[in-house]
């Protein structure tokens, strides 16, 4: 798996120029500043800019416990939509569909995922076939099989053989004119996505 930061929350040049000295003094991120403005805008009669001008020291200064208290309050109260103004975009490569299924359960994350509908994963395509993730429990070692007495099997060899068979059947479906959006039904949860 490879993860690369593409972009993240950034204050406008106008706001940055107004607050640059304080941002440098307290060593806070643009995301922290944006969060303060958004959170306090919900609970104050002041505008976001007024909050930043008037309350910056209170929340980020030497007595910055107010900032910690405020964040804890927001999380405990479930008012986390105010934190959605902070964003980070990552390029994530080589993770399984199974991992993707777990990640997409989280409301605060948004995804743009390599499509198995619009991309061919046949051996003859530009992709050269589908890549896959081998679970860490699938080891390259010989173990006694529970399927028969005096039989040993290698989990890694078995796993890789299954991936080759799935690739072969996917290729057959594509060669029979089945659209990739339907042929993808045979691809495993171990198939990589970016």
Regions found by a protein language model. Name each.
Residues 1-194:
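Family-specific signature for flavin-dependent thymidylate synthase
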């Amino acid at each position: 798996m490879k993860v690369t930061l593409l972009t993240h929350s950034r204050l406008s040049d106008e706001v940055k120029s107004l607050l640059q000295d304080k941002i440098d003094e307290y060593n806070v991120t643009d995301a922290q500043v944006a969060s303060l403005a958004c959170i306090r805008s919900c609970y104050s009669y002041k505008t976001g800019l007024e909050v930043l001008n008037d309350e910056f020291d209170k929340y980020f200064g030497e007595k910055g416990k107010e900032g910690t208290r405020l964040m804890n309050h927001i999380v405990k109260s479930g008012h986390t939509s105010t934190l959605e103004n902070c964003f980070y975009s990552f390029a994530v490569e080589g993770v399984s569909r199974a991992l993707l299924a777990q990640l997409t359960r989280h409301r605060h994350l948004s995804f743009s995922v390599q499509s198995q509908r619009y991309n061919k994963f046949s051996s003859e395509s530009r992709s050269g076939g589908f890549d896959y993730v081998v679970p860490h429990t699938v080891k390259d070692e010989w173990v006694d099989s529970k399927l028969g007495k005096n039989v040993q099997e290698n989990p890694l060899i078995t796993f890789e053989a299954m991936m080759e068979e799935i690739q072969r059947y996917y290729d057959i479906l594509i060669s029979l004119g089945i659209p990739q959006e339907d042929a993808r039904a045979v691809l495993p949860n171990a198939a990589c996505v970016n």
